[in-house]
Design a protein with these regions (language model features):
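N-terminal cationic and glycine-rich segments that engage phosphates or anionic surfaces
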Residues: 1-96, 101-416
Length: 416
C-alpha cells in the first residue's frame, strides 16, 4: 500500500488527482463548520447526544449535524435518490433501456431527484426542530430549508468532482471523510470510559480493539477473495498460424458489491428513526424511534435483511451471467465440462449466487454483531461494524483505483 502511494505521489498526473481529492476534503471540512442561520446549535447538539440514531447520523456527516452546518443532511438524499433510480431502472422498461444506452441521462435524473428529496427532508428538519429555531416565521423556515438543500447539492457536486477529477468514488469518499474525522472524538470517549470504569473499562476497550482488528482482517480478506472459473479457448488455424488454445479464468469476487449495500441499507433505515426524533413529545414518534433504535433487535434484523437484499440486487445489475456466457461463446471459449451458451450461463449464475450469499451474510454479520455487542457492553460509541465496513471498503477500493491508474500510466508510457 505504502509503495503504491509513494509511486502515485511521484507520478505527476496521479499526484494532481490526490491533491485535488484532498482539496475537496478540505472544502467539505470547512463546510461542516459553516452554520445554518436562525438555529440554536446547543439544542441540536443536546438532541444528537440523547438520540443514538442522530448521534450516528452526526458521525457519518463528519460532525456537520451537531454543528447544524450547511452540510447537516450529509449526502443521504443523494443516496436515497440513487436507490430509487436503480430500483426504477429494473421496474420501468424505458429507464432500463436508458440505463444501458445513456448513463448520463440517468445521472441527471438522479441529481434532480436528489434536490427534491433534499428539499422535502430539509422542510421536515426545519419543522421537526422547532424548539431549536431562533425565528419560527415562514421566511426563516424557508431560508433554513433552502440552505440545507443547497448544502446537499454542493456535497453532491463535490462528490462528482472527486469521481471525475480525483481518485476513487466521490460520494463514498465523502462518507469516508466524515467517519474518519470523528475518530479522534471516538478515541477520547474510550479514554474517558477507561478512566470512569478502571480495570474493567480497560478490559472492555481491549476486547473491543481485538474484535475491531479481527474484523478489519476479515473485511480485507473477503474484499480481496474471489472464485476463479476456468475458461479454455479452442485452437484455430488461420493460414499457417495457430490462434487460441490458451486458458484463462472468470474472477467472481466474494464481495462484488463492495460497501454499496451497507450504505444503501443504512440510508433507508435512518430515515424513519430520524424523522421520529424530530417529535420528542409525540407518543407515536417515540414508539417509532424505539423500534428503529440502532441497538435494538428489530432494527439490526431489518438492517441485516436489507444488506443481503442490496448485495444481491447490486450484484445482479452489475454482473450478467448471460452476457458473460455469450461473450465466451463468441470468442470460441468454453468452461471445461460444460456446453457453451445456456448451460454455461446457468453454471456461472449458480456459482455467483452461492458466493454472493456468503458475501452478503458476511457483510450483514460485520455490520450488525459489533453494534449488538456494544449495546451489551454499554459502549455509547458510534464506530461500529457499519463505520468499519465503510472505512476499510472505501480505502481498499480507492487503493485499487490508484493502482489501476498507475498501471494505465505505465502502459501509456510503454506505447509512446
Amino acid at each position: 500500500m505504502f509503495s503504491t502511494l509513494k509511486s502515485a505521489i511521484k507520478a505527476e498526473d496521479t499526484r494532481k488527482k490526490i491533491l485535488f481529492t484532498l482539496l475537496m476534503f478540505l472544502v467539505f471540512r470547512i463546510g461542516t463548520h459553516i452554520p445554518v442561520p436562525n438555529i440554536d446549535r446547543t439544542i441540536i447538539a443536546q438532541l444528537a447526544d440523547q438520540a443514538k440514531l442522530l448521534g450516528f447520523f452526526d458521525m457519518i456527516s463528519g460532525g456537520a449535524f451537531k454543528n447544524f452546518s450547511i452540510f447537516a443532511m450529509s449526502i443521504t438524499p443523494y443516496i436515497n435518490a440513487s436507490i430509487i433510480m436503480q430500483l426504477l431502472t429494473v421496474i420501468v422498461p424505458q429507464l432500463e433501456q436508458m440505463a444501458k444506452e445513456d448513463r448520463k441521462k440517468i445521472a441527471e435524473y438522479t441529481r434532480y431527484l436528489t434536490v427534491v428529496l433534499a428539499f422535502v427532508q430539509a422542510i421536515g428538519v426545519s419543522f421537526g426542530f422547532k424548539s431549536a429555531l431562533v425565528d419560527s416565521s415562514f421566511g426563516s423556515i424557508a431560508l433554513i430549508a433552502l440552505t440545507l438543500t443547497a448544502g446537499t447539492a454542493c456535497l453532491m457536486w463535490i462528490g462528482e468532482l472527486i469521481t471525475e477529477k480525483g481518485i476513487g468514488n466521490g460520494i463514498s469518499l465523502i462518507i469516508f471523510a466524515g467517519i474518519v474525522s470523528r475518530i479522534p472524538s471516538g478515541l477520547f470517549y474510550l479514554y474517558q470510559y477507561i478512566e470512569a470504569n478502571g480495570a474493567i473499562g480497560f478490559l472492555v476497550v481491549l476486547l473491543f480493539a481485538v474484535i475491531a482488528y479481527a474484523a478489519i482482517v476479515a473485511v480485507v480478506a473477503i474484499h480481496e477473495g474471489q472464485r476463479r472459473i476456468p475458461v479454455q479457448y479452442a485452437k484455430r488455424v488461420v493460414g499457417r498460424k495457430v490462434y487460441g488454445g490458451q486458458s484463462t479464468h472468470i474472477p467472481i469476487k466474494v464481495n462484488s458489491a463492495g460497501v454499496i449495500p451497507v450504505i444503501f441499507a443504512m440510508s433507508i433505515l435512518m430515515f424513519p428513526g430520524t424523522i421520529a426524533s424530530f417529535f420528542p413529545n409525540s407518543g407515536f414518534a417515540t414508539t417509532i424511534a424505539n423500534i428503529f433504535d440502532a441497538s435494538g433487535i428489530f432494527y439490526n434484523f431489518l438492517y441485516a435483511v436489507l444488506i443481503v437484499f442490496f448485495t444481491y440486487f447490486y450484484s445482479a445489475i452489475t454482473f450478467n451471467p448471460v452476457d458473460v456466457a455469450e461473450n465466451i461463446k463468441k470468442n470460441g471459449g468454453f468452461i471445461p465440462g460444460l456446453r457453451p451458451g445456456r448451460p454455461t450461463a446457468e453454471y456461472i449464475s449458480k456459482v455467483m449466487g452461492r458466493i454472493t450469499l456468503f458475501g452478503a451474510l458476511f457483510l450483514a454479520a460485520i455490520a450488525v454483531l459489533p453494534a449488538l455487542l456494544m449495546g451489551l457492553l454499554d459502549l455509547e460509541l458510534y464506530f461500529g461494524g457499519t463505520a468499519l465496513l465503510i472505512v476499510v471498503g472505501v480505502a481498499l477500493d480507492t487503493m485499487k483505483q490508484l493502482e489501476s491508474s498507475l498501471l494505465m500510466r505505465s502502459y501509456e508510457g510503454f506505447m509512446k
